[in-house]
């Protein structure tokens, strides 16, 4: 409780400093107050000077805790922003796969999982999930093309084993 009071004082004194809002959001998140966590984290995002992939990834993570379709959809938007900035963040891909699964978009969840496994060096699993994704993913979508790319890249590696 005291840390929250101290952070609120700092925010009142320095309202445009995103770090204080982010930290207070983390405190609320650690205490399972997800509504307050997302409120303060959104304030942090609105005050950052430059685009930061981690802020968007964390917001996506916070929104997933609600386990509500509209929040999961919002999480997808934040996680996609994060991945546009840094497409090599395996944890952001993991969170995106969870968000897609929560909204019932299993083919897109499989695609995001394929990307994650590719980044962490799990080539066979990446290949398997890319193949699964391709079966139901919307043809000619960016995810469809990327799934095809992954399959083509990995086919040679997987067939050697």
Q: What is each PLM-predicted segment?
A:
Residues 25-32, 39-103, 107, 111, ...:
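Alpha-helical adaptor scaffolds
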Residues 2, 74, 110-112, 125, ...:
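Zymogen propeptides/activation segments of proteases
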Residues 13-18, 30, 34, 72, ...:
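Solvent-exposed, acidic/flexible segments
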Residues 4, 8, 21, 38, ...:
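Extracytoplasmic/secreted envelope proteins and their assembly/folding machinery
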Residues 1-47, 149, 159-161:
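Extracytoplasmic and endomembrane cell-envelope/extracellular-matrix remodeling and assembly machinery
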Residues 19, 53, 91, 142-143:
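Secondary-structure boundary/capping residues
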Residues 117-161:
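Terminal, low-structured helical/coil segments at or just beyond the last alpha-helical repeat
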């Amino acid at each position: 409780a005291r840390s929250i009071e101290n952070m609120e004082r700092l925010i009142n004194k320095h309202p445009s400093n995103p770090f204080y809002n982010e930290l207070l959001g983390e405190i609320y998140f650690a205490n399972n107050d997800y509504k307050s966590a997302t409120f303060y984290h959104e304030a942090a995002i609105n005050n950052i000077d430059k685009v930061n992939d981690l802020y968007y990834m964390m917001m996506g993570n916070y929104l997933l805790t609600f386990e509500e379709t509209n929040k999961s959809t919002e999480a997808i938007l934040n996680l996609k922003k994060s991945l546009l900035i840094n497409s090599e963040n395996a944890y952001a891909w993991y969170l995106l796969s969870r968000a897609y699964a929560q909204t019932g978009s299993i083919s897109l969840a499989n695609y995001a999982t394929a990307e994650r496994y590719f980044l962490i060096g799990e080539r066979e699993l990446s290949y398997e999930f890319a193949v699964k994704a391709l079966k139901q993913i919307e043809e000619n979508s960016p995810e469809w093309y990327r799934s095809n790319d992954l399959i083509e890249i990995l086919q040679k590696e997987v067939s050697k084993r």
